[in-house]
C-alpha cells in the first residue's frame, strides 16, 4: 500500500487567498534634469519607493547612474553612436539634478569601424581637470590609404604606431588639463580632440575615424551644490538682453491725442 497523505484528514490552509496589492502604489516618479551643455534638459523620469519612516526616497535616488543616448539629449541623429552617463547628485522637490559621469560609443559603431587591411591604434591616459575631476580617456584611430596609393592594404609600422600613440596621449593631456569638466564635455560632442589628433598625426601616417572611444571618471571632488546648480541654470547673457520696443499703431496715437484735447 502506498504511503501518503489522506486527503480527507488533511486540513486546509489558514488565511485563504492572499490579497493582491499594486506595487506601484508605494512608489513615486521623479523628473530627471540634464546639465545645460545638452539641448534637452528634461530627459526622462525615474521611479523610487516613497518615504517610509526613516527610509527617505531621496536616499534611494542619490548616486543613481542613467545611460542616455546623445541623439536624445541633443535632438541630433548623427550623434546616435555616443552614450552619455549622468549621475544623480541632488534632489529638489520632484527634480533630480544630474552631472556628467562617463561616455562611451555603441558596439555597433565600433564593429562598423574595424575592417581588414587597416591598423587599429588605441591609446589611453589618466588626466585631471581644473575642477579636480580625475578621468581616464581612451582614444581610437584607424589608418587610411595615402593619395594615389595602389596597394590594397595600409598597415602602419610598429615605430609609427608608437609615435601616433604618444601624440594621442599628449593631445588628450593638453586638452583636458587646461579646462573644467563642463568645457571638456563640450569638446567630446563635436569630436574636436579626435580632429586634432588626426591633424597632428598626418605627417606620421594618415588617419581616419579618430574618436574618443570611452571616458571613465575615476575620482570626483566633494559635491558642491552651488557649482552643480550653475550647470543647470542659464547664463546671465541670455537673461540680460533688452527687448525691442514694438511700434505704436496709428489708432492708439489718435485715441490718446483725442483724450488729451478733452
Curated annotation (Swiss-Prot):
Alphabetized GO MF terms: structural constituent of ribosome
Chain segments annotated as transmembrane: none
Single GO BP term: translation
Pfam families: Ribosomal_S3Ae
Subcellular location: Cytoplasm
Keyword set includes Cytoplasm: yes
Keyword Oxidoreductase on entry: no
Quaternary organization: Component of the small ribosomal subunit. Mature ribosomes consist of a small (40S) and a large (60S) subunit. The 40S subunit contains about 33 different proteins and 1 molecule of RNA (18S). The 60S subunit contains about 49 different proteins and 3 molecules of RNA (25S, 5.8S and 5S).
Homology family: Belongs to the eukaryotic ribosomal protein eS1 family.
Protein name in the entry: Small ribosomal subunit protein eS1
Species annotation: Plasmodium vivax (strain Salvador I)
Lineage: Eukaryota, Sar, Alveolata, Apicomplexa, Aconoidasida
Amino acid at each position: 500500500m502506498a504511503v501518503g497523505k489522506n486527503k480527507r484528514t488533511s486540513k486546509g490552509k489558514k488565511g485563504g487567498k492572499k490579497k493582491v496589492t499594486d506595487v506601484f502604489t508605494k512608489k513615486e516618479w521623479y523628473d530627471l534634469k540634464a546639465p545645460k551643455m545638452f539641448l534637452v534638459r528634461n530627459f526622462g523620469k525615474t521611479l523610487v519607493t516613497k518615504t517610509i519612516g526613516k527610509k527617505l526616497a531621496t536616499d534611494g535616488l542619490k548616486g543613481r547612474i542613467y545611460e542616455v543616448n546623445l541623439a536624445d539629449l541633443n535632438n541630433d541623429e548623427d550623434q546616435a553612436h555616443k552614450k552619455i552617463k549622468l549621475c544623480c547628485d541632488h534632489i529638489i522637490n520632484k527634480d533630480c539634478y544630474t552631472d556628467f559621469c562617463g561616455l562611451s560609443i555603441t558596439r555597433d559603431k565600433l564593429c562598423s569601424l574595424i575592417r581588414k587591411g587597416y591598423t587599429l591604434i588605441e591609446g589611453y591616459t589618466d588626466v585631471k581637470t581644473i575642477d579636480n575631476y580625475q578621468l581616464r580617456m581612451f582614444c581610437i584611430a584607424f589608418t587610411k590609404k595615402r593619395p594615389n596609393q595602389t596597394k590594397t592594404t595600409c598597415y602602419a609600422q610598429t615605430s609609427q604606431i608608437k609615435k601616433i600613440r604618444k601624440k594621442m596621449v599628449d593631445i588628450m593631456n593638453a586638452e583636458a588639463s587646461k579646462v573644467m569638466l563642463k568645457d571638456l564635455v563640450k569638446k567630446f560632442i563635436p569630436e574636436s580632440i579626435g580632429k586634432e589628433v588626426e591633424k597632428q598625426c598626418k605627417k606620421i601616417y594618415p588617419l581616419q575615424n579618430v574618436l574618443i572611444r570611452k571616458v571613465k571618471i575615476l575620482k570626483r571632488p566633494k559635491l558642491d551644490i552651488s557649482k552643480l546648480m550653475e550647470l543647470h541654470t542659464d547664463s546671465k547673457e541670455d537673461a540680460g538682453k533688452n527687448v525691442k520696443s514694438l511700434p505704436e499703431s496709428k489708432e492708439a496715437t489718435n485715441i490718446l491725442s483725442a483724450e488729451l484735447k478733452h
